[in-house]
Amino acid sequence: MRERGPVTPAKSSAPPERPWTTGTAPGSVPLLGHTMALWRRPLQFLASLPAHGDLVEVRLGPSRAYLACHPELVRQVLLNPRVFDKGGVFDKARQLLGNSLSVSRGEDHRYQRRMIQPAFHTPKIAAYTAAVADDTRAAIGSWEPGRTLDISDTMHALLMRVAARTLFSTGIDEATIDEARHCLRIVSDGIYKRTMAPLGIMEKLPTPGNRRYDRANARLRQIVDEMIRERRRSGADHGDLLSTLLRAEHPETGKGLDDGEVLDQVVTFLVAGSETTASTLAFVFHLLGAHPEVEKRVHAEIDEILEGRSPTFEDLPSLEYTRGVITESLRLYPPSWMAMRVTAAETELGGRTVPAGTMILYSAQALHHNPELFPDPERFDPERWLGDRAKEVERGALLPFGAGSHKCIGDVLALTETALIVATIASRWRLRPVPGTTLRPEPKATLEPGPLPMVCEPR
């Protein structure tokens, strides 16, 4: 059912005058509402909701929530953090991430962001890419023609090493990196389950899964804490992210980060710098293998620009089609597939009065697969992002990294790493999907591709 209401723009934005449509998601069942649909088939459920309005009511048990399905409504939510607060659901993520940038709120978030932002300025990102290129070349140096590998697992292993090198540069051995990766997967999966669980009591029970989660969380933070303490003792500046964080000062107060604050930020960057980028790369290589005509254009562009040498940071702006492939992969398979806010006060959204304490959902999955925003949305079409066609995309329709003051601080670094790794691998190898392989995206803390066996073919 769709209803029409007057446009009531948030004070922080000026949307065009148009009648918003509101509706209710079908299929609600007594007591549970739409909870089971969101649990069992979340991607399909979310992608179906824009057909019911710009703002769609969803029942989560006895509570009402709303999914913002129009880019302008999502912008109003993300650009007005004082009204649309991160909410209690982020408190569960603090078990892993502490009071880091990704979960902090209000003035604390603004304070942290101003301190950390210099670590992601362009000269710093350019410096980090040397480690990315070195680790990628080392990883593919052991590949053999005809070898079958799980590209998802392979990219996660590579990106954990890249993240460790970007953060620490030296002083962390391969065994510790592997242990940290193992712990990170357990804790990341556990955070998602705890965030989505309807009852908070489950995480307090002494189950094998909870004990495994607690051990992994403690060990991961211990590994990072030891690295921080050692770097403080040495006082050395290795030009890596850890050195930048240890020397960070607020531009107005001159205050730096203590070891606990650095620990929280480093763990956050490990999660964001390995899990999300690794999944994106796995999706990219699967899509290239499944679309030979696109792969051929990527190879032709890389060969023309690189002329047989390894790619560098300076080459990336010239790899326009390759970057279009990455953007289209992020559209089809956004790492942050759903997020939420909670209204801190009564407000209006999409022509509806929304009480304080109401959960507001927004979903890149719903936006990116909306045929009104992206014609033929299930089609893999990198040319959407080239030339005049890219200008036709509605503002805010693409949302892989969020928006506003809470937009992912490392988005440029993530895109840079992804493009550099794709160009490095594609300059030397083709990856062919094993016949019969079916891509089944797994919505967890981030959208993961699941196992993707592929066969290596030298170019």
From Swiss-Prot:
Record-annotated disulphide pairs: none
Spans annotated as Disordered: 1-27
Reaction equations catalysed: cyclooctat-9-en-7-ol + AH2 + O2 = cyclooctat-9-ene-5,7-diol + A + H2O
Pfam family, one: p450
CDD domains: CYP170A1-like
The protein's Enzyme Commission number: 1.14.99.61
Molecular function terms from GO: heme binding; iron ion binding; monooxygenase activity; oxidoreductase activity, acting on paired donors, with incorporation or reduction of molecular oxygen
Group of enzyme by EC: oxidoreductase
Cofactor: heme
The organism's place on the tree of life at top rank: Bacteria
Positions contributing to heme binding: 408
PANTHER family (alphabetical): BIFUNCTIONAL ALBAFLAVENONE MONOOXYGENASE_TERPENE SYNTHASE, CYTOCHROME P450 FAMILY 4
Identification of the protein by name: Cyclooctat-9-en-7-ol 5-monooxygenase
Gene that encodes the chain: cotB3
